[in-house]
């Protein structure tokens, strides 16, 4: 008979894709932390831009594989709009983190602010919590206490980032008021770093909404 012995095509695993994206979020965040802590000059930082972009390109590849799988897939583990939202939201974390790295180079920073080191650690912590949560997310229809606590942790880290950002910006305007260019540049840099943590929280909130939905 025709078709006998023909191997059935393996079904695409969307949860594996989410985990891969979350792992790349951690990888990009750790690169940012490394760059911030080892900073010497913007010229030296330029050498790290290809590494950051390679991670971003790898993440784009995961996105494309998800969208390609969705086209012919009639039965998906989550609603299509939820899969698309998760994929795009996770990819946004990586894009934002790469943008922070690029900004340090584009703005030609001459020194690394100590609070940037604190912020980079928060970004790593948020991404790590999200990545750990993503491992359990495939069982989101039977949410575990561990998964819930990890999502709460992401929100707690975002609260820490908000408090740090508030104090940093105030200090900039109080202590650097005679240097408006420095205030402007570092405000934009810290805003971009805070956006990374905010996006981690947005993904965690999306995960929580999906858990409630199912």
Description of each model-found segment:
Residues 1-214:
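Cytosolic, long alpha-helical scaffolding segments
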């Amino acid at each position: 008979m025709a078709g006998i012995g023909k191997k059935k095509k393996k079904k695409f695993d969307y949860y594996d894709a989410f985990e891969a994206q979350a792992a790349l979020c951690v990888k990009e965040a750790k690169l940012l932390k490394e760059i911030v802590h080892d900073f010497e000059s913007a010229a030296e930082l330029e050498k790290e831009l290809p590494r950051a972009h390679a991670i971003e390109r790898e993440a784009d590849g995961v996105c494309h594989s998800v969208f390609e799988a969705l086209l012919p897939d009639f039965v998906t583990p989550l609603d299509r709009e939820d899969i698309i939202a998760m994929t795009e939201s996770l990819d946004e974390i990586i894009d934002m983190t790469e943008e922070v790295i690029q900004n340090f180079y584009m703005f030609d920073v001459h020194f690394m602010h100590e609070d940037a080191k604190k912020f980079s650690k928060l970004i790593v912590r948020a991404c790590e919590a999200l990545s750990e949560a993503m491992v359990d997310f495939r069982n989101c229809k039977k949410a575990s206490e561990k998964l819930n606590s990890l999502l709460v942790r992401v929100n707690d880290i975002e609260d820490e980032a908000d408090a740090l950002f508030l104090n940093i910006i105030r200090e900039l305007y109080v202590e650097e008021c005679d240097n408006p260019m420095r205030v402007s540049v570092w405000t934009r840099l810290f805003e971009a770093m805070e956006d990374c943590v905010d996006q981690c929280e947005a993904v965690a909130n999306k995960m929580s909404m999906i858990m409630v939905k199912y």
